[in-house]
């Protein structure tokens, strides 16, 4: 919504023209879910002043001013966001929600998350539902924006070379500190304990390749745990690489799936195993995956496997 326009640059064409003038700089919206929190904001990319053809231009200041204009000085009409902009964003969001099913692997993973976490925030899509989007008004969206500005923690990262004091002054002068109140980071609640029963859900679709997603709880294993690094090594051997047990055995040796990988979420103490299968191989693939997990639990891996996994993880950084 904010990318549509601000007071200084009231439409996307004006913003684009300004960015183009600033040596094709770029400002993009950031909207991601991490654990049970939403991270929203903007990122900016621009050329280092030393590489500009004309000396004396200060892109750090110019791009920062535009960024903060977009973020903190939006275009408001009658105490709400401009109706035409809201209508356009709602239409785009509804289309995005409807298009999720086109990516079957991502859709299956999201369905597993919804079923596994239920009404907890982690189980709710960051895009919301079509009904929620349609019901939202320009006024409600603006009030939610103001609440976000007033209460959400703000973190600013800069990657590159700059005058730190200059950047600090820009930030201090543009963040509306007078409107800030009751800012705090949300508490994190990991998914601990065993479920009462194993839940299995099948969504029937006319597809050639089925998607099998398994969600497991990892009680006591999370990003803050002392053995978090050890778990990452475990996952690399189990299903996190092309040399993993899932890939080499379930996919290559048994030919039970087109792909098979494990994806931990250390922020929520959860492990997801995703695979593409022939629908008739569902039970075989599931049992084979669990057999590889049992092999890991039994210590069926070598020192070479550990060394290779560590090297792979280090190279990823």
List each model region and its residues.
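Active/ligand-binding-proximal structured segments within catalytic/core domains
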Residues: 1-22, 214, 225-238, 248-250
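Short, polar/flexible loop-turn hinges at active-site or ligand-entry regions and domain interfaces
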Residues: 5-9, 50-54, 73-82
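M16 family metallopeptidases and their MPP-like homologs
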Residues: 12-69, 106-128, 153-159, 214-217, ...
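Acidic/histidine-enriched alpha-helical segments
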Residues: 16, 73-97, 183-193, 291-317
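Structured catalytic cores of enzymes that bind and process phosphorylated ligands/cofactors
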Residues: 34-35, 117, 140-141, 174-177
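Hydrophobic side chains in well-ordered alpha-helices
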Residues: 63, 144, 167-170, 246, ...
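Scaffold signal of the M16-like zinc-metallopeptidase fold and its non-catalytic homologs
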Residues: 94-151
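An aromatic/glycine/proline-enriched structural segment found at the starts
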Residues: 116, 122, 126-132, 147-151, ...
